[in-house]
Curated annotation (Swiss-Prot):
Location of Pros-methylhistidine modifications: H257
Protein name: Methyl-coenzyme M reductase I subunit alpha
Family per record: Belongs to the methyl-coenzyme M reductase alpha subunit family.
Annotated positions binding coenzyme M: Y333, Y444
């Protein structure tokens, strides 16, 4: 690769040439060099005057702006933003990405239909299914169907709530009102669509989106309960049941338990979170939630790094950065993986190396390949930091660099072998090589999991090993070290992207997010982050309708 993908960003960030070894500090104007910090200062003064309590004051504590307060290019875009605009609190797109995951649950109709036909002796047809879907799309946002004197939600406040279905049977899908159908044939390339339909078969599955405002006010575990209540009421109404008859219990069981797929599993009590919270979302699920693979299927690097960006934001910025630690600094561990095209450059190098030497997914799935590919990519990355001092200043933390280099090594190894476990092994080897070269990786404890992780890559034992696609933020040793989990998710995607697989872990999850009615566009994760940073993203769940006009 003659042109480094990160060069333009370095030239935009710094006055000096990227190869220059000298710069200046302390004479840059402090926080005033940043438009966003200046805006914050003015806003903080207004807040303080209004409430009578001092607020934002960057002159307290360590002075800001001793170095360049650099802009960031959101990778794969031409958009440059300030770092503050990539904090999830300041970015509506990032918030909505998590909202759209948390408020989703997949519920089968197969058990319910069996109850209707076998217990109640009623017929289930495409017409009755469409009638049920009309009913549940009335009820799911928070409206009543079988009770009188019920309070209801304002439709404009919950406009993002709806229910769709999908099936692997084209004949059934064609008979249901298309407004309610996720059309697998339209949303996926032909070969992916055929694979997914074969996985689903004749089953019919509902994709439920509860209102953003509900999951924000409550929590992720509310999603399946809210969903089950409205599904149960809609079944009673659509199939004209007596609400107290015995079969009602079967419907409740089907809607709440029997065929329910959460986006995240229940966490142990010491972390005190229910289903559909970030700590329970497996890496393979997150890879399937990201939809890059159905539009960028010829570019495994783009597909894998879109998953990295998705995971870096969710796992590092929201889960570890706030749920677990309560801090604000974790943002910059995440942004290193999706800004300035640095990880992109390193990973495209690795992909080209693999293609030239082996072919994608053609290398032996063994340690010789891990040693070859991960070493080559790691040394390439470290050489870039040596050659371009501005790159070191861009990723000023050792843990940022360690995560980026190891992610490129891991993805590239997975491209070679077609296996996520050897990709993970490539990650750990990269960490060892990096520490050997630079004597350190990051802050104290950053590399805890990297020092012990290699021991359970290929051993599948209780609490000591799992296929990477099944691991998640709550996997032992992964629980608190930033700069890892999003990258692991990308490595879990990498072999499947290189092979052109239709999904990574769960075909139902992949299909559920192939939905044009979602507020967040999961086919273009980094582009959506950029829109949020520019304040151009329109989120759901806003309360302007019920607040005083200004």
């Amino acid at each position: 690769m003659a042109d480094k993908l990160f060069i333009n960003a370095l030239k935009k960030k710094f006055e000096e040439s990227p190869e220059e070894k000298k710069t200046t500090f302390y004479t840059l104007g402090g926080w005033k060099q940043s438009e966003r910090k200046t805006e914050f200062v003015n806003a903080g003064k207004e807040v303080a005057a209004k409430r009578g309590i001092p607020q934002y004051n960057p002159d307290i504590g360590t002075p800001l702006g001793q170095r360049v307060l650099m802009p960031y290019q959101v990778s794969t875009t031409d958009t440059y933003v300030e770092g503050d605009d990539l904090h999830f609190v300041n970015n509506a797109a990032m918030q909505q990405m998590w909202d759209d995951i948390r408020r989703t649950v997949i519920v089968g109709l197969n058990h319910a239909h069996a109850v209707i036909e076998k217990r109640l002796g009623k017929e289930v047809t495409p017409e009755t299914i469409t009638h049920y879907l009309e009913t549940v799309n009335h009820a799911m946002p928070g409206a009543a169907v079988v009770q009188e004197h019920m309070v209801e939600t304002h439709p404009a406040l919950v406009a993002d709530s709806y229910v769709k279905v999908f099936t692997g049977n084209d004949e059934i899908a064609d008979e249901i009102d298309p407004a309610f159908v996720i059309d697998i044939n339209k949303q996926f390339p032909e070969d992916q669509a055929e694979t997914l339909k074969a996985e689903v078969g004749d089953g019919i599955w509902q994709v439920v989106r509860i209102p953003t405002i509900v999951s924000r006010t409550c929590d992720g575990a509310t999603t399946s309960r809210w969903s089950a209540m409205q599904i149960g009421m809609s079944m009673i109404s659509a199939y004209k049941q007596a609400a107290g008859e015995a079969a009602t219990g079967d419907f409740a069981y089907a809607a709440k338990h029997a065929e329910v797929i959460h986006m995240g599993t229940y966490l142990p009590v010491r972390r005190a979170r229910g289903e559909n919270e970030p700590g329970g979302v497996p890496f393979g699920y997150l890879a399937d939630i990201c939809q890059s693979s159905r539009v960028n299927y010829e570019d495994p690097v783009r597909v894998s790094l879109d998953v990295v960006a998705t995971g870096a934001m969710l796992y590092d910025q929201i889960w570890l950065g706030s749920y677990m630690s309560g801090g604000v600094g974790f943002t910059q561990y995440a942004t290193a993986a999706y800004t300035d095209n640095i990880l992109d450059d390193f990973t495209y190098f690795g992909k080209e190396y693999v293609e030239d030497k082996y072919g994608l997914c053609e290398a032996p799935n063994n340690m010789d390949t891990v040693l070859d590919v991960a070493t080559e990519v790691t040394f390439y990355g470290l050489e870039q930091y040596e050659e371009y001092p501005a790159l070191l200043e861009d990723q000023f933390g050792g843990s940022q660099r360690a995560a980026v280099v190891a992610a490129a090594a891991g993805c590239s190894t997975a491209f070679a072998t077609g296996n996520a476990q050897t990709g993970l092994s490539g990650w750990y080897l990269s960490m060892y090589l990096h520490k050997e070269q630079h004597s350190r990786l990051g802050f104290y404890g950053y590399d805890l999991q990297d020092q012990c992780g290699a021991s359970n890559v290929f051993s599948i034992r209780g609490d000591e090993g799992l296929p990477l696609e099944l691991r998640g933020p709550n996997y032992p040793n992964y629980a608190m070290n930033v700069g890892h989990q999003g990258e692991y998710a990308g490595i879990s995607q990498a072999p499947h992207a290189a092979r052109g697989d239709a999904f990574v872990f769960n075909p139902l999850v992949k299909i559920a997010f192939a939905d044009d009615n979602l507020v967040f566009d999961f086919t273009n994760v980094r582009g959506e982050f950029a829109k949020g940073a520019l304040r151009e993203f329109e989120p759901a769940g806003e309360r302007a309708l019920i607040t005083p006009a200004k």
